[in-house]
UniProtKB/Swiss-Prot annotation:
This is Uncharacterized protein RP673. It comes from the Bacteria. InterPro entries: OMP_Chaperone_SurA, Trigger_fact/SurA_dom_sf. Coiled coil: none annotated. Disulfide bonds: none annotated. SUPFAM superfamilies: Triger factor/SurA peptide-binding domain-like (SSF109998).
Length: 295
């Protein structure tokens, strides 16, 4: 009789363990994500995107989206630790979503309830997004954009003309010897202000030119456009002689304050995004993540 009771007890314990295991679809650093949470998140995504009928492939994609959403959420909550998200921030975030969708304030949560969606899953995602926004906000204080980066961005847009100050070195003949000497000269050209006549006088001439980029013709325009100040071009051939261009300065013309601020904001947001992606990628990389739900 004792042996029979032992077998029943072991069998019962095994079934309880199995039931507990099947109710967990993933774990993040030993923090479980339950099947109920997964179904709630999946239902929420479907409700917010007005999805009703799914093909098998779409259902698989939605499963992946829901489980990864919950994993990212868990990582963010663990990153935040004991820091609480104030209720007014949550309320304002919900109002912002309602405003964007032209909904009356207070109607979004009721809409989810009407769709049989647990609002708690939505609130948790709002909280995780607010944690993410706090991370982005803290990163913004460490991001700086240089004038050089602004100039490069404006130049690459091809929407503004540029005034170029450059030194153009031209060989006195087109011999192989002249080509070799011009290559040696190219390696010695570091700054326009440091150029001395003795560097080139025996085999080349130098002309200082100020011109709008749009007025420079042919291949020279492409070469000059790609050069940064105090950077010499490679040696290139023009009319059976060899030339080098050393750009001294570039001045972008007709850029107003609004255009400049737009570029600064664009570059700042780009840097913040890159830093944030690195942080979120490292979160995943360092975390112990197990997915027990079939992908």
């Amino acid at each position: 009789m004792h042996k029979l009771l032992l077998i029943i007890t072991v069998f019962f314990t095994f079934n309880v363990a199995q039931a507990s295991l099947t109710s967990i679809v993933a774990s993040v650093n030993d923090k479980p994500i339950t099947l109920n949470e997964f179904h709630a998140r999946k239902k929420m995504i479907m409700a917010l995107n007005n999805i009703e009928n799914l093909t098998a492939d779409q259902d698989k994609q939605l499963n992946d989206l829901a489980i990864n959403s919950l994993i990212d959420e868990s990582l963010l909550f663990q990153y935040a630790g004991d820091r609480e998200i104030p209720q007014d921030e949550i309320d304002n975030a919900i109002k912002s979503i309602e405003d964007r969708n032209k909904m009356a304030h207070g109607s979004l949560l009721q809409y989810l309830k009407n769709k049989s969606v647990n609002p708690e899953s939505f609130i948790l995602q709002i909280k995780s997004e607010l944690i993410k926004m706090n991370i982005l906000s803290s990163l913004s204080r460490s991001v700086q954009v240089s004038n050089k980066e602004i100039d490069v961005a404006i130049l690459s847009s091809d929407q503004k003309d540029v005034e170029i100050l450059m030194q153009v070195f031209r060989s006195k003949d087109g011999s192989n010897k002249a080509f070799t000497k011009m290559n040696h000269l190219k390696n010695r050209l570091k700054k326009c202000s440091d150029v001395k006549r003795t560097l080139y006088d025996k085999f080349a001439t130098m002309q200082i030119i100020t011109s709008k980029l749009s007025n420079i013709e042919g291949v020279k325009q492409t070469i000059v456009k790609d050069l940064i100040p105090d950077k010499a071009s490679n040696v290139f051939e023009v009319n059976n002689k060899f030339e080098i261009i050393l750009v001294c300065s570039k001045k972008i013309l007709n850029v107003n304050a609004d255009e400049n601020n737009y570029v600064v904001n664009f570059l700042t947001n780009k840097k913040i995004s890159q830093k944030a992606q690195k942080i979120f990628k490292n979160m995943r990389k360092k975390a112990a993540i197990r997915i027990m739900f079939p992908s």
